[in-house]
A protein has these predicted regions:
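Blade-edge motifs of beta-propeller repeat domains
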Residues: 20-38, 77-104, 145-179, 214-240, ...
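Beta-strand-rich domains and repeat architectures in extracellular enzymes and scaffolds
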Residues: 33-66, 71
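Beta-propeller blade termini
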Residues: 41-49, 106-115, 182-190, 233-235, ...
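Acidic/hydrophobic-patterned starts of short beta strands in beta-sheet-rich repeat architectures
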Residues: 51-61, 117-127, 192-201, 248-256, ...
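Short glycine/acidic-enriched loop and turn motifs that connect beta-strands
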Residues: 62-68, 128-134, 203-207, 261, ...
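Loop/turn-rich, solvent-exposed surfaces of beta-rich toroidal or solenoidal domains
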Residues: 340-387
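Blade-level signature of beta-propeller repeat domains, shared across WD40, Kelch, NHL, RCC1
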Residues: 407-454
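C-terminal outer-membrane/trafficking sorting elements
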Residues: 459-470, 474-549
């Protein structure tokens, strides 16, 4: 059996479905959660831009219910210093510190790139417009460039306020009160001029297809740069599609997805050429289309899943270029009761979570199950025809069930796959772009490498085991067992589902080798799911337990 499947936990639920669930290695609470109560709008992870050896996560907040706090756009850099247990905010910016009247709508975009090619990486943040009398043509693209060196900071620091402001901003539109809402963004060099462009799919009629470039991102934010709208559907004599919800790029062509048409925009060497084809039968794809060379033959394919606004199918589709069209192969129908059960596919990312050389494609969901919040993993098995579904594997990477997402709450489209530690396998990060009852869900990190996070020397075998708390469920006490093969410095902590520490049972204590049992008394805690995390030297493992009072 493949390496990944040896590491997966196999659980059973009431439907009889076997769930190959990848262990949750970390639960990261939302920064300033009382302010960021509208969900997480987007995140990117796995970078070490400042070169300090600590892996970084960049995230932006979201607005779901238009409350006074969630309409304020905020961006954060999180980092976990080596040897520490929790991620910390080391840099942040509030868009209203630069433009006081700006407020945001739902589902912003976020990317890391070097648009001007100066060697300094940039955070490219697409704040979704909310036009009003005070802000009729707001900045929709915000670029914060890294300060350089080992600095944590991005942007230009205002000498008066001390706040961090963008190096560059752009409205996209040249007129007021245009409703432009990019939801999917790729960075690529479509026209082959050696400089990256922004390729944006927008879900509103003000502009649906956006291809843009910038000549410079000024270090001092003096606004000397020039943004150019290279192409939009406004240039066409007529437009045969609808609002766009997704985009994928294959070499010099970009494919924009909606329920009316799949629109193709290609660079032919001298100009952009538009064509269109029939949509997927299940309607739109929701920011989940992923382009990759699946079988290493030099050809780029697309994997995408259906969300809504078509028929009731919810397929994972393999899409292959053929002239001006895409050849379509349905790989898995997730609409059945055991999977989505009428729910929707949304969000996606790719990487190699089992280090087997084959790409793992991760897809999120909305209204899935029961159980709720299914995260799907789709992988080509490395041999055979890629159009034969028998050569693919579908597993469930995680499902939040009732512990994170009661009923059908949450919108689990915010996903990234990145190497968050020093082992060779990538990890999955995911969360919801909408809250539950005004509380944002935390970021979850899934690690197929046997619960291990932050291992500095992957050649060193794990020297401890963390057992299942017993009894489980419990009220109000339970025992957490662990075994050390050799002595080490131990920390044992308990967290709630928001990622907040509710108890530290052992704190950096030198502990002898052998079997250990630690009593946990939850008499002062509310019923619910809790996670216990054992850190021995620089290696962590985690487990889950349920308190029923």
């Amino acid at each position: 059996m493949k390496n990944l499947l040896r590491l997966l936990l196999v659980l059973s639920i009431g439907t009889g479905l076997a769930l190959a669930v990848i262990p949750r290695a970390s639960i990261i609470p939302v920064p300033e959660d009382s302010l960021n109560n509208g969900g997480i709008g987007n995140l990117v992870a796995g970078y070490d831009i400042d070169g300090d050896g600590n892996i970084e996560i960049y995230m932006v907040n979201d607005n779901w219910a238009d409350s006074p706090t969630e309409i304020v756009p905020r961006i954060y850099k999180l980092e976990r210093p080596y040897g520490e247990e929790e991620f910390q905010v080391v840099w942040s910016a509030n868009a209203q510190d630069f433009t006081p009247d700006i407020i945001q709508n739902t589902w912003p975009t976020l990317a890391v790139a070097d648009l001007d090619g100066d060697g300094k990486m940039e955070l490219i943040w697409g704040i979704v417009n909310w036009t009003n009398a005070s802000s009729p043509n707001p900045y929709r693209i915000w670029v914060y460039e890294h300060e350089g060196g080992d600095s944590d900071n991005f942007g230009v620091q205002n000498p008066v306020t001390g706040k961090w402001e963008p190096n560059s901003v752009w409205t996209i539109a040249d007129a007021d009160n245009q409703n432009i809402r990019p939801i999917s963004m790729k960075v690529a060099d479509l026209n082959g001029d050696g400089k990256d462009q922004l390729i944006l799919a927008s879900r509103a009629s003000g502009m649906r297809i956006i291809i843009a470039s910038v000549d410079d991102i000024p270090d001092d934010g003096d606004f000397s740069e020039t943004w150019t709208l290279d192409f939009s559907e406004k240039e066409l004599p007529s437009y045969d599609a609808d609002n766009k919800w997704d985009v994928a790029v294959i070499e010099n062509s970009a494919y924009f997805f909606c329920e009316a048409k799949i629109s193709k925009v290609s660079w032919n060497g001298s100009e952009y050429v538009y064509s269109s084809m029939d949509p997927l039968p299940g309607g739109i794809t929701f920011d989940c289309a992923q382009a990759a060379d699946i079988n290493g033959d030099g050809n780029i394919e697309i994997l995408a899943g259906e969300y809504l606004y078509g028929d009731a199918t919810r397929n994972i589709w393999l899409l292959q270029e053929s002239g001006d069209t895409l050849i379509r192969t349905p790989l898995f129908d997730l609409s059945v009761e055991e999977y989505l059960n009428g729910g929707r596919i949304c969000g996606g990312a790719q990487g190699d979570i089992d280090n087997d050389g084959n790409i793992d494609f991760i897809f999120g969901s909305r209204f899935s199950g029961p159980p709720n919040a299914m995260m799907f993993r789709v992988e080509y098995q490395g041999s055979g025809d890629i159009t034969d579904p028998a050569n693919w594997e579908l597993t469930i990477a995680d499902t939040s069930s009732e512990e994170f997402a009661p009923g059908t709450s949450g919108f689990w489209n915010v996903i990234d796959v990145a190497n968050m530690d020093d082992d060779p396998e990538d990890e999955i990060l995911y969360t919801s772009s909408i809250p539950n009852a005004g509380v944002s869900f935390p970021i979850v990190i899934l690690d197929s490498n046997d619960y291990t996070v932050g291992v500095r020397n992957v050649l060193t075998p794990l020297s401890f085991e963390l057992g299942q708390a017993y009894p489980n469920p419990f009220n109000p006490t339970t025992v957490i067992p662990f075994t050390l093969e050799k002595a080490g410095t131990v920390t044992l902590s308990v967290f709630n589902i928001k990622g907040q520490n509710v108890a530290t049972l052992i704190s950096r204590e030198y502990t002898e080798a052998g079997k250990h049992n630690v009593m946990f008394d939850a008499g002062n805690l509310a019923s619910g799911v809790y996670f216990y995390q054992l850190k021995v030297d620089n290696t962590m493992r985690a487990g889950k337990m349920t308190l029923n009072k």
